[in-house]
Amino acid sequence: MIFFFLPDLIYLLDLLDLLVKNSSPVAVMSIFFLVRACISASAAISFIAVGAPATGPCVEFSDRLPNVKRAVCDAAQLQPSAGKSVKGQTLWVRDVKPLNPNLRVLIVGAIHGDEPSSAAVALHWIGLALDAPVDTPQTVHWRFVPVLNPDGVLAQPPRRVNANGVDLNRNFPTPNWDRDADAYWQRRTGKDPRRWPGPKPLSEPESQFLQQQMESFKPDLIVSIHAPYGVLDFDGPSVPPSRLGRLYLDQLGIFPGSLGNYGGVHKGVPVVTIELPNAMRTPLDSEMRQMWLDLLRWTAERIGAQPGKLPRAP
């Protein structure tokens, strides 16, 4: 392809002037149309190469998530999964896997679309996982799903529920879901549309995707990031962490169809639910790092110390 910059254009005009002085009128017109076509093609190609909008998740995520500069998102190197949202948005994942990992941990953000700080923390933690502190006693295969509910995150304004109006954190197949989920929604929430559990368990592609991840990845621990209650919740076996950073343990109970109930109580996989203090603003970078280091230490001490926690093929 031919590209014209200013010096080239000046040279071309000088050459054209010389040709005009020494050519017939027909030749001059032919030269004119040829030059105009070349310049037009060059301009179009330059726009495609330089000015065309970029694609990929970071274009939208860096605009919608707090404290997520484009460089932070790009460095995470999110990979497309086979999962899609109701509206066909790709569900992006990132695996950070050392050699011979001892444990597998699944970290999920933005189950609720109006809690974008949860996705932002997950993206920052990918960068910390890639740094892999040398003093960590356990090596962990991390799988991140930073935005489980992209339709909710990208809605204007962001919405807790997915595009079908379902609260994904009430859509998991806990025992007696058919009996309990709708009754809880009607009696305890007053039919709050932001907490509708859906028509049946796993009715939504996003909750189906996460359940499939649990079945195939077989995590030893699930970390679910939410906001804005500013506490830690825990469900399942093992001793819960007393704190992560400035967040202290305050177990909130279980709900029909919740991830904590399904994973921690029903499936026996420890589920740490992090409730950040603000849904629209992340903690300071130093605080996010401290939360991460505390999570590493607790994971090594409590999850890694459990009998039978040996590497398994995912």
For the regions a language model picked out, list residue spans one by one.
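Active-site/substrate-binding loop(s) of hydrolase catalytic cores
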Residues: 102, 106, 116-251
